[in-house]
């Protein structure tokens, strides 16, 4: 568990996904056995850590299962009960097997697994890739096969593997050591008759540094090994000092940097939902849920379930938002626009609908008109039906939708696209994921990276052929000529200079120069491995090279 890592961006964010084509070859989907069917949509359920930390016992989990089965959470899709750290004895048994703490779990974990399964839940557990867990209990290093078999024999089908107490062995960097250990676990799980869902915490141990290269590198391999990855800081625990809202926003910002990795079978994990945290307002709790749902992020509640209010149960079981979260396309909502106050995000859904999510980060109520063109809807004379996913009310819109949001509130609309108006061009910010600066089009055909300001000049369309053009000047296209990057007429004969590809490393590569877009003075340079100035976020819907 990583706590206290500083927020890496106050303004930046990023992501991508799949639907149009910015490249020729789609990126292969992996799971812990190279099968996205193992976890095609993000997990939903309960974990004790953020609410109770090491104060866990058998009664907590039986009471949680009983309540979730009765209050609608299980039936809404929250079907996993997961233990976190501190469940085990301080010593392994004589044969090296892990043992549960018999005081905390007098009936044993196999008994508890049967109990929660009888209530309609899956059962998950926590371990660590080091020699000790974060809480000082036995880690799985050099016991991987034995522990995997133990967990399976207990009826467990989900493993959260933390990364405390991992040290580089001779001849390896720390990143290489983590890759070896998590890769070995992947091999162990792949050989099992019924592989466990594999939640990897490795990226969290590389987040929040001055140089993101190792963090990006770890993010490159976690989708190959498992189904979800805890990528950054821990969400603030119930008893922790500091602002719970700031903690949510910190993890939200981290998640926006990583959308290019997510697809069916692998999900970015910005950590638990904390709906009973006393430091959150009602709007902040609802925003936390709505943003995670829009991301198609794991919805794992860490709260005292029996004491949740009716209002908290109501938003946690919102069918329309859960349907977005569980949408089989598994796109992450990405930034269409951003300024100091509003984040506007969008994504596509499997049936062709378009999602609009708007977050008010400011401290006062905000009213704003949002053009449908910012959402990737470019056809004229169209009327769309927009459903408010909080209350189910619908409205007809044509060129814009009007939003009024209280401080720290989030609006979510699902737009139905009528026949003849159903084409979508991936649209949104192109921004550097280290600095958070947005690519900005100027009227003199120049481009620059500037602080994100919500202007149309920072919103870009990405066409199926790999052409990138600003919404403010749709007849102009981003082009490279030698080291120079500029806007030029889209009908230029220099077609290769206007074609870009986007690999999973986050580079924007130009077909003519074979170089990479580089922040700074905005120029083309040789492509370097996961260099901060060359890693960018693009709109959802752009397919990876």
From Swiss-Prot:
Q: Name one GO cellular component term.
A: extracellular region
Residues bearing attached sugar chains per UniProt: 57, 95, 101, 131, 211, 363, 444
Show which residues constitute the signal peptide. Answer: 1-31
SUPFAM superfamilies named among the record's database cross-references: (Trans)glycosidases, Glycosyl hydrolase domain, Ricin B-like lectins
Q: Which cysteines are joined by disulfide bonds?
A: 54-86, 134-164, 438-452, 477-490
What Gene3D superfamilies does the annotation carry? 2.80.10.50, Aldolase class I (3.20.20.70), Golgi alpha-mannosidase II (2.60.40.1180)
A Pfam family found in this protein is Ricin_B_lectin
Entry's InterPro entries? Aldolase_TIM (IPR013785), Glyco_hydro_27 (IPR002241), Glyco_hydro_27/36_CS (IPR000111), Glyco_hydro_b (IPR013780), Glycoside_hydrolase_SF (IPR017853), Melibiase_C (IPR041233), Ricin_B-like_lectins (IPR035992), Ricin_B_lectin (IPR000772)
What Enzyme Commission number does this protein have? 3.2.1.22
Quote the catalytic residue positions.
162, 220
One GO MF term on file is: carbohydrate binding
Q: Where is the Ricin B-type lectin domain?
A: 421-518
What is the protein's given name?
Alpha-galactosidase A
Q: Which organism is it from?
A: Aspergillus niger
């Amino acid at each position: 568990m990583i706590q206290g890592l500083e927020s890496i961006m106050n303004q930046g964010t990023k992501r991508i996904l799949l639907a149009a084509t910015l490249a020729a070859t789609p990126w292969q989907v992996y799971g812990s056995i190279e099968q996205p069917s193992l976890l095609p949509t993000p997990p939903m359920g309960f974990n004790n850590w953020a609410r109770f930390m090491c104060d866990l016992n058998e009664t907590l989990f039986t009471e949680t299962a009983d309540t979730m089965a009765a209050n609608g959470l299980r039936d809404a899709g929250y079907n996993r009960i997961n233990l976190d750290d501190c469940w085990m004895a301080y010593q392994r048994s004589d044969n090296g097997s892990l043992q549960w703490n018999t005081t905390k779990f007098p009936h044993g974990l196999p008994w508890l697994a049967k109990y929660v399964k009888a209530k309609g839940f899956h059962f998950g557990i926590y371990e660590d890739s080091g020699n000790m867990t974060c809480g000082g209990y036995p880690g799985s290093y050099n016991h991987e096969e034995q522990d995997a078999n133990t967990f399976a024999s207990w009826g467990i089908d989900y493993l959260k593997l933390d990364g405390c107490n991992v040290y580089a062995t001779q001849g390896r960097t720390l990143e290489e050591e983590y890759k070896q250990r998590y890769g070995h676990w992947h091999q162990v799980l792949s050989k099992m008759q019924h592989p466990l869902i594999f939640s990897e915490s490795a990226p969290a141990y590389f987040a929040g540094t001055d140089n993101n290269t190792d963090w990006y590198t770890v993010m490159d391999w976690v989708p190959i090994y498992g189904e979800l990855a805890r990528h950054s800081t821990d969400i603030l625990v119930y008893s922790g000092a500091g602002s719970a809202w700031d903690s949510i926003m910190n993890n939200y910002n981290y998640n926006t940097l990583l959308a290019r990795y997510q697809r069916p079978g692998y999900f970015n994990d910005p950590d638990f939902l904390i709906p009973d945290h006393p430091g959150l307002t009602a709007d902040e709790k609802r925003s936390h849920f709505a943003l995670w749902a829009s991301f198609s992020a794991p919805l794992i509640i860490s709260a005292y379930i029996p004491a949740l209010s009716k209002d908290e149960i109501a938003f946690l079981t919102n069918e329309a938002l859960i349907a977005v979260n569980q949408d089989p396309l598994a796109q992450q909502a990405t930034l269409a626009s951003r300024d100091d106050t509003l984040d506007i995000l969008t994504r596509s859904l499997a049936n062709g609908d378009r999602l609009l999510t708007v977050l008010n980060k400011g401290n006062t109520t905000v009213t704003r008109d949002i053009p449908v063109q910012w959402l990737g809807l470019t056809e004229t004379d169209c009327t769309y039906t927009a459903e408010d996913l909080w209350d189910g009310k619908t409205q007809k819109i044509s060129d814009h939708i009007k939003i009024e949001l209280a401080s720290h509130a989030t609006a979510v609309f699902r737009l139905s696209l009528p026949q003849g108006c159903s084409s979508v061009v991936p649209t949104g910010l192109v921004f550097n994921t280290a600095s958070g600066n947005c690519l900005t089009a100027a009227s003199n055909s120049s481009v620059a990276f500037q602080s994100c300001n919500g202007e149309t000049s920072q919103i870009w369309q990405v066409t199926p052929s790999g052409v990138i053009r600003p919404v403010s000047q749709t007849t102009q296209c981003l082009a490279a000529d030698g080291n120079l990057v500029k806007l030029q007429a889209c009908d230029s004969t220099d077609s290769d200079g206007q074609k870009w590809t986007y690999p999973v490393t986050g580079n924007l590569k130009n077909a003519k120069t074979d170089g990479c877009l580089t922040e700074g003075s905005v120029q083309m340079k040789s492509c370097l491995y996961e260099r901060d100035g060359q890693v960018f976020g693009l709109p959802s819907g752009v397919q990876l090279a």
